[in-house]
Amino acid sequence: MTKSDETTATSLNAKTLKSFESTLPIPTYPREGVKQGIVHLGVGAFHRSHLAVFMHRLMQEHHLKDWSICGVGLMKADALMRDAMKAQDCLYTLVERGIKDTNAYIVGSITAYMYAPDDPRAVIEKMANPDTHIVSLTVTENGYYHSEATNSLMTDAPEIINDLNHPEKPDTLYGYLYEALLLRYKRGLTPFTIMSCDNMPQNGVTVKTMLVAFAKLKKDEKFAAWIEDKVTSPNSMVDRVTPRCTDKERKYVADTWGIKDQCPVVAEPFIQWVLEDNFSDGRPPWELVGVQVVKDVDSYELMKLRLLNGGHSAMGYLGYLAGYTYIHEVVNDPTINKYIRVLMREEVIPLLPKVPGVDFEEYTASVLERFSNPAIQDTVARICLMGSGKMPKYVLPSIYEQLRKPDGKYKLLAVCVAGWFRYLTGVDMNGKPFEIEDPMAPTLKAAAVKGGKDPHELLNIEVLFSPEIRDNKEFVAQLTHSLETVYDKGPIAAIKEILDQV
């Protein structure tokens, strides 16, 4: 039943919080005068539906103190989040939308927010403060400046060059991590743990390896060795579908609960976090709220990245070209649904190490069921974002592994890459242009347009593709054929043709 609307809804903040307790659950733990044990870089929707929720549960159900979160916006684009966090005292509404039921509550585990472009030094000092035990990250795959093809730091990126030469005003997470750890080092303090919460294979190992490479470029070998020896960075597997917030969600929260919230979060009910127990300066007891804290995350991580994220990307590019708006519509397309199931069964699952207690085909089916949730309204366009960071981590590794096998199978994987390449032209199948949101968009689009049905222009981008894939004549021939079919007949026809061959 509608209780309010946007004109009569009450703005959410610390002063009004109590007025909502008869409508939905609110934080009952103290939020003032508590220490922030975690500094989180990159406060987007996913962080607020995942790590912040686990911390909220610990504070709400187990009365944990001094582990609240100080959020940090690194980019100029984070100004909108800064304004919302400031106006709302870092409170926000979380709406969990299932296929049948909806659950909502107010989250208060973020108790401070800093906007780095305004005062980078203040952020560095906050990270260096001994009360900070963990610096966590959700900066997207592109924020790591890691080339999957060369397994190295992108040292020619302008932002990395800036951070090497202008430590007083960093652009990347490495500039901030380096300067903050340097202060801890000079002050004789234990280093904080760097905890990546991004969807990447070996996310913890990757961020630490890239940070050490960055430190070595700064020509302080002793400090670089200290980072390598003392700083911990656990691997993790994170999972929760969390679409971008739009005015539609803001209106829904206002109409349903009478809350005027500038930054609500809508997510699926499912939530999972598998975390390596590797911390240098303590950690909260996450096991109490359902986090799987384990010795080795690798098998869980590969399963999720290859099956869920890889499947997501395949559905995204092919579904976009097929004219779909929402992911649940793509899942309900019988041809694409069958394609994802066969792709996983034939070309991805055989490459995966076993995960205790998990049947991979059942996992794939559960993923498709989650994606079919129409209440989430997850857009295909969102899934297509930042492909240069996603495809080399979610899809291309399976191709590399198949190419190394004498009887390697990759026809279905090639269709996914063909869909991505056709998408990168920035023009849909009806000739309508659209914007490609990707840090490499100008380079990718120029190569896609120039190459057309010939994939070589894109394959020659060395930061994305290694010679192993670029010089494999059989794979390139298969990719070329799939790309031609997508261009000439459309994505559904290309999928059907390949399904008939496997």
From Swiss-Prot:
Its EC number is 1.1.1.67. SUPFAM superfamilies: 6-phosphogluconate dehydrogenase C-terminal domain-like (SSF48179), NAD(P)-binding Rossmann-fold domains (SSF51735). Keywords: NAD, Oxidoreductase. The keyword Plastid does not apply. Disruption phenotype: Rescues temperature-sensitivity of MPT5 deletion. Pfam families: Mannitol_dh (PF01232), Mannitol_dh_C (PF08125). GO terms for biological process: mannitol metabolic process. There are two genes for this mannitol dehydrogenase in yeast, DSF1 and YNR073C. Present with 125 molecules/cell in log phase SD medium. This is Mannitol dehydrogenase DSF1.
